[in-house]
């Protein structure tokens, strides 16, 4: 599924928050997002099952739905990332891509935990390749 920049921005906002957000909260989190744009994007993402209504809350005197991402949305974003990487894989090696990803994380303890996670994954992948 192809997502336009506004849809990607709304998805990013929803994934970065640990709670469901109203459309107004999404507008306030985004750069240059308007209420009408966010509502149109949410309708499309709801139809595609990339977001879901997770509740209803009072927003002043009005009831507002709160939205959160679905598991499917993470899969779609992961696939978009991989498709983008595939377009540049002849230029950027996997090692350079991974090194660049680690360089973006300034939290050294988080970086160390992720390195250990990748080491475990690499050991598993190596074992699978050797067994074939």
Would you name each region that the model predicts?
Residues 3-6, 22, 56-78:
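Short, cationic-aromatic polyanion-contact patches
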Residues 46-57:
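A short, conserved structural fragment
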Residues 14-19:
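Short helix-capping/hinge SLiMs at alpha-helix to coil transitions
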Residues 74-128:
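Amphipathic alpha-helical dimerization/coiled-coil segments
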Residues 1-13, 124, 128:
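Short alpha-helical segments that sit at the start of domains
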Residues 33-34, 38:
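Short coil turns linking two alpha-helices in DNA-binding domains
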């Amino acid at each position: 599924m192809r997502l336009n920049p506004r849809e990607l921005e709304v998805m990013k906002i929803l994934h970065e928050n640990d709670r469901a957000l109203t459309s107004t909260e999404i507008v306030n989190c985004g750069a240059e997002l308007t209420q009408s744009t966010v509502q149109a994007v949410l309708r499309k993402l709801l139809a595609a099952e990339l977001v879901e209504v997770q509740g209803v809350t009072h927003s002043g005197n009005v009831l507002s739905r709160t939205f959160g991402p679905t598991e499917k949305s993470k899969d779609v974003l992961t696939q978009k990332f991989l498709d983008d990487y595939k377009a540049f894989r002849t230029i950027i090696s996997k090692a350079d891509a991974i090194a660049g990803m680690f360089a973006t994380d300034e939290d050294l303890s988080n970086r160390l935990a992720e390195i250990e996670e990748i080491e475990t994954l690499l050991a598993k992948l190596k074992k699978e390749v050797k067994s074939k």
